[in-house]
């Protein structure tokens, strides 16, 4: 996950515990979490017609899961990928650390991987996970924005702003995030030209 620290040495090999909510984590407490990897497995709700509501609800575990797990002595965090599809592709995204809380490594697991892990745990198996990652945060680099402007003939002082970001995560090619957003922005501009 973007912002995660690396695993130290040869990585982590330890038991995992599964939670869906912050309340689940709290109910387990330090006694059942310490020294383990916390697996945040809250699926996105497919009933929402506006899927960003489902994403917005679950993203809290990716963003803050490592912090909350570390408060209970966890040594790592795994987060179910934020997708309605069941597939083998772990998604990336950003996460954070809080000052004064130990930093633990965090990673995403594909939705299919999450389903399989969860089933093994439900079957009563003691599941151990090997996690090794070599993350690094590099110094900031200057980047640039692409800006286009079309002045209206009528009411040119009024502004309609349309945008998307041109960067993408290193894991993918950027077609979805944010190639799709860029194409939608261009489509809006094309519609404005027609109007």
PLM regions and their residue ranges:
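A non-catalytic alpha/beta surface segment that caps or lines the substrate-entry region
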Residues: 1-18, 99-149
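Noncatalytic luminal/extracellular "stalk/propeptide" segments of secretory-pathway proteins
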Residues: 1-37, 41-49
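Second-shell loop/turn segments in exported
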Residues: 3-4, 14-19, 50-66, 102-107, ...
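Solvent-exposed loop/turn segments at secondary-structure junctions
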Residues: 23-24, 44-47, 82-86, 113-114, ...
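Alpha-helical metal-binding/catalytic segments enriched in His/Glu/Asp
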Residues: 61-62, 146, 162, 166-195
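Non-catalytic positions within long, well-ordered alpha-helices that form the structural scaffold/packing
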Residues: 67-73
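Surface-exposed loop and adjacent secondary-structure segments within mature catalytic domains
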Residues: 79-108
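Acidic/His- and Gly-rich active-site-bordering loop/insert found
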Residues: 110, 142-167
């Amino acid at each position: 996950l973007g912002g995660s620290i690396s695993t130290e040495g040869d990585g982590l090999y330890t038991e995992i515990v599964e939670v869906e909510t912050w309340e689940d984590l709290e109910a387990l407490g330090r006694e059942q979490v310490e020294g383990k990897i916390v697996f945040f497995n809250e699926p996105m709700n497919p009933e929402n017609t506006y899927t960003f509501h489902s994403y917005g609800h679950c993203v809290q575990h990716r963003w803050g899961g490592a912090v909350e797990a570390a408060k209970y002595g966890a040594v790592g965090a795994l987060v179910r990928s934020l997708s309605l599809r069941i597939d083998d592709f772990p998604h990336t995204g950003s996460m954070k650390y809080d000052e004064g809380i130990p930093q633990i490594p965090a990673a995403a697991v594909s939705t299919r991987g999450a389903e399989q892990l969860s089933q093994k745990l439900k079957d009563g198996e003691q599941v151990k996970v090997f996690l090794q990652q070599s993350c690094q945060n590099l110094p900031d680099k200057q980047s640039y924005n692409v800006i286009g402007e079309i002045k209206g003939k009528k009411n040119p002082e009024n502004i309609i702003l349309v945008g998307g970001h041109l960067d993408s995560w290193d894991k993918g090619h950027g077609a979805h995030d944010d190639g799709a957003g860029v194409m939608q922005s261009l489509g809006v501009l094309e519609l404005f030209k027609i109007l």
